[in-house]
Amino acid sequence: MPPLPALAISAIVIAVALAAGAATSWLLAPHPSGAFARCATAEQLAPRHYAAPPPMCIDPAASYQATIRTTKGSFTVDLLARSAPRTVNNFIVLAEHGYFDQLHFFDNRSWVIQTGDPLGNGHGGPGYDLPPEPGASGGWAPGSLGMARFPDGRISGSQFFILKQAWPGGNPTVDYNRFGSVTRGLDVVGQLTSSDTIVSVQVKRT
């Protein structure tokens, strides 16, 4: 058999390396298990970028709790699956796939802090928007979690905010998808700044 041309050999080496890299990335990426084993994202188009919101995999009648570990410490969130099922489902699926890991709290104000943007500038997201869930609006006490809205009114698929204090002037004048409430560690939330990041998000069915 004659020797392969140098270019052909190089192409084979590159292909094998790329395949190995893809396999390694898949192995290192978090994979849902247990109660969330069937929670899958839509088709992944690029890192942290998907074709559509994830299909429903949670039970809206069940109770879910998230522990968000940050560089300042951890806090616990009760997720409002009954009033915001699609928003909670989206949050759980992204969390189970490690979407929020290492993302900065890029927008820090005296009364609110925001995260969930892979670009870290308020313009990024998972490639899709969420539908409004007005049943989850209202009750904006300190510790409330809501999905951010873009200036054109679209609801972000990944950016969310946490109230450190009461909403200035009372409740917001537009509807946000309120999907959770901090039940433990609100003092940690109050200490977060734009230099802090999410280390991990762990969700359990309670």
Spans of features found by a protein language model:
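Cyclophilin-like peptidyl-prolyl cis-trans isomerases
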Residues: 1-206
